[in-house]
């Protein structure tokens, strides 16, 4: 029987609902419970797949190929025993699309389709389905309490809490405790009004997570409890931390897991063992020295656009006991600049992306890394550009390009994938006229790594599974020419023999991959490719001293 914890936010947005929810999930998992998580997004887009990274940040790809909110990345990084799927994230757009499709088919037998019950029932069905087979499902509602867009979701939560009952549901509400310097005190009124907003729609919070920059004394906690109908021990302080990976320990010290287990009747559970989290924090806060990675992209003004890459580099730093400083380099600006901005880098990374804008700057950075022996990692578009750069400057194809940028190029090193097998083994077909949304090669795919290559050595095995999100792929017609020039194809897809990884054997560390390894990195386990990349950056750092 699944128990549900609903997570809402009030006062302001960006309080960290996702991180707080994931930290609670990690704590419950450490008690031996089977935990999953769900994110409900109120926007009308069907999914974030076609949204600008400047609008939404990163699109996180699940194993089964769902394009989801970046919060699902937090969920997977904090949980070890649960992988997110397309069931774990849905939007208002997805719900309305589903309901309208049913109406067009006549499923409602001519009845009037309304927000209540049709939309709310659809939301409830999705929540219950996502929670099947788990002890606890933690469900985050995007946005802020009081937003008009989230009202159907809040009503669905209210109904579920009534239908499932007190012993199977809880609500955790995040609020802000602002500090007024002129008065030298924390203000509780915004929290009171936020809870009042919840009460007005029939929902009583059970736990309050109070975000603050300062310590909160017992009197303030009692005051908050008095005005919000919450137990004083359920007023949890979440003070700004040096790293988000300290938060599970902070919640444990305030007995958040005990509150939940008591409510749900979970007895005879072991104490939470947070040793792994303590080790992560210790390594993160006590690095031996700093290495610098230049990340060359076109969305660098918003680091959340590369959230999983940033986190994977952080995790690799933990594994190597170094601090990884990311220097963001605007690819467009680099096109008109010299490469001096890259000279302080111990390693260079070109992440995934779409479109022609900034590609010449990225290839400029790739050429610099290749010619100067700087460790280089290319991801998705970064791999495609590494192949094009090599073809232009080494393999004698100066007009080499991708059909994404130039359909009439003389040397189409990169072309549209027209056919491939999806994660279910079913044939997928695409053309240049296909819709942009949901038409990519998505999700986990198997690859075979070539024996004797550095990539095979890094992974330590012949077959790997990594997640994909792309429409274009290296053109197999040019494999022979590229390999004769010195670049090695080090990995192929198991099903279609598509190029998955390339490397330059004569270079100290030059690997580029078509997939997205960042999606499977975690703070406790890291990822072999990123760990090896940062190890190479350490070697480069020592050489340059």
Curated annotation (Swiss-Prot):
GO molecular function: ATP binding; CTP synthase activity; glutaminase activity; identical protein binding; metal ion binding
Physiological role: Catalyzes the ATP-dependent amination of UTP to CTP with either L-glutamine or ammonia as the source of nitrogen. Regulates intracellular CTP levels through interactions with the four ribonucleotide triphosphates.
HAMAP family reported in the protein's UniProt record: PyrG
Chain residues that bind UTP: 13, 187-192, 223
GO BP: 'de novo' CTP biosynthetic process; pyrimidine nucleobase biosynthetic process
Active site feature: 380, 516, 518
Class of enzymatic activity (EC top level): ligase
Sequence positions that bind L-glutamine: 353, 381-384, 404, 471
Residues bound to ATP: 14-19, 71, 239-241
UniProt: Mg(2+) binding residues: 71, 140
EC annotation from Swiss-Prot or TrEMBL: 6.3.4.2
Domain of life: Bacteria
Native species: Acinetobacter baumannii (strain ATCC 17978 / DSM 105126 / CIP 53.77 / LMG 1025 / NCDC KC755 / 5377)
Domain Glutamine amidotransferase type-1: 292-543
Residue positions binding CTP: 13, 147-149, 187-192, 223
Region (Amidoligase domain): 1-266
Keyword Repeat: no
ATP-binding found in the keyword field: yes
Note: CTPSs have evolved a hybrid strategy for distinguishing between UTP and CTP. The overlapping regions of the product feedback inhibitory and substrate sites recognize a common feature in both compounds, the triphosphate moiety. To differentiate isosteric substrate and product pyrimidine rings, an additional pocket far from the expected kinase/ligase catalytic site, specifically recognizes the cytosine and ribose portions of the product inhibitor.
Notes on how activity is controlled: Allosterically activated by GTP, when glutamine is the substrate; GTP has no effect on the reaction when ammonia is the substrate. The allosteric effector GTP functions by stabilizing the protein conformation that binds the tetrahedral intermediate(s) formed during glutamine hydrolysis. Inhibited by the product CTP, via allosteric rather than competitive inhibition.
Catalytic reactions on record: UTP + L-glutamine + ATP + H2O = CTP + L-glutamate + ADP + phosphate + 2 H(+); L-glutamine + H2O = L-glutamate + NH4(+); UTP + NH4(+) + ATP = CTP + ADP + phosphate + 2 H(+)
Keywords: ATP-binding, Glutamine amidotransferase, Ligase, Magnesium, Metal-binding, Nucleotide-binding, Pyrimidine biosynthesis
One Gene Ontology term, aspect cellular component: cytosol
Pathway(s): Pyrimidine metabolism; CTP biosynthesis via de novo pathway; CTP from UDP: step 2/2
Name this polypeptide is given: CTP synthase
């Amino acid at each position: 029987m699944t128990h549900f914890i609903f997570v809402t936010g009030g006062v302001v947005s960006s309080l960290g609902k996702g991180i707080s929810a994931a930290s609670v999930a990690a704590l419950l998992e450490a008690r031996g419970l089977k935990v999953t998580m769900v994110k409900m997004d109120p926007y009308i887009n069907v999914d974030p797949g076609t949204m600008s990274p400047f609008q939404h940040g990163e699109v996180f790809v699940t194993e089964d190929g769902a394009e989801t909110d970046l919060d699902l990345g937090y969920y997977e990084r904090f949980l070890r025993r649960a992988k997110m799927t397309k069931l774990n994230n849905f939007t208002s757009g997805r719900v309305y699309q589903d309901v309208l499709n049913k109406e067009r088919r006549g499923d409602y037998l001519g009845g009037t389709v309304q927000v209540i019950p049709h939309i709310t029932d659809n939301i409830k069905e999705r929540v219950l389905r996502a929670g099947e087979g788990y002890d606890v499902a933690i469900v985050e509602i995007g946005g802020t309490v009081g937003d008009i867009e989230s009202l159907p979701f809040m009503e669905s939560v209210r109904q579920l809490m009534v239908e499932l009952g007190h012993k199977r549901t809880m609500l955790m509400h995040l609020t802000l405790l602002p500090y007024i310097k002129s008065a030298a005190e924390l203000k509780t009124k915004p929290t009171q009004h936020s809870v009042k907003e919840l009460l007005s729609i029939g929902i009583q919070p059970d736990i309050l997570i109070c975000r603050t920059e300062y310590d909160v004394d017992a009197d303030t906690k009692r005051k908050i409890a008095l005005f919000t109908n919450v137990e004083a021990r359920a007023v949890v302080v979440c003070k700004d931390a040096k790293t988000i990976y300290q938060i599970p320990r902070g919640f444990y010290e305030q007995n958040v897991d005990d509150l939940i287990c008591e409510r749900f009747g979970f007895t005879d559970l072991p104490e939470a063992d947070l040793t792994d989290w303590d080790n992560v924090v210790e390594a993160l806060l006590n690095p031996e020295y700093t290495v610098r990675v230049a990340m060359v992209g076109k969305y660098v003004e918003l680091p959340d656009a590369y959230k999983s890459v940033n986190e994977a580099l952080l995790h690799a730093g933990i594994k190597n006991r170094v601090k990884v400083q990311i220097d963001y380099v605007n690819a467009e600006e680099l096109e008109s600049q010299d490469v001096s901005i890259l000279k302080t880098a111990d390693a260079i990374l070109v992440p995934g992306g779409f479109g022609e804008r900034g590609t010449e700057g990225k290839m400029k950075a790739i050429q610099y890394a290749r010619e100067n022996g700087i460790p280089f990692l290319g991801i998705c578009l970064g791999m495609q550009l590494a192949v094009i750069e090599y073809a232009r400057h080494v393999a004698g194809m100066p007009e080499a390009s991708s059909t994404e940028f130039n359909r009439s190029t003389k040397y189409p090193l990169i072309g549209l994938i027209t056919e491939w097998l999806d994660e279910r083994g079913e044939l997928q077909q695409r053309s240049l006229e296909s819709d942009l949304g949901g038409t990519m090669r998505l999700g986990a795919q198997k690859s075979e790594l070539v024996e004797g290559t550095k990539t095979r050595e890094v992974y330590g095995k012949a077959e790997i599974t990594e997640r994909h999100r792309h429409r274009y792929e290296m053109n197999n017609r040019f494999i022979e020419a590229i390999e004769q020039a010195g670049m090695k194809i080090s990995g192929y897809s198991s099903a279609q023999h598509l190029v998955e990884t390339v490397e330059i054997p004569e270079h100290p560390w030059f690997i580029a991959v078509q997939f997205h390894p960042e999606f499977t990195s975690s703070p406790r386990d890291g990822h072999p490719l990123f760990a090896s990349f940062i190890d190479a950056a350490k070697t480069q750092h020592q050489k340059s001293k």
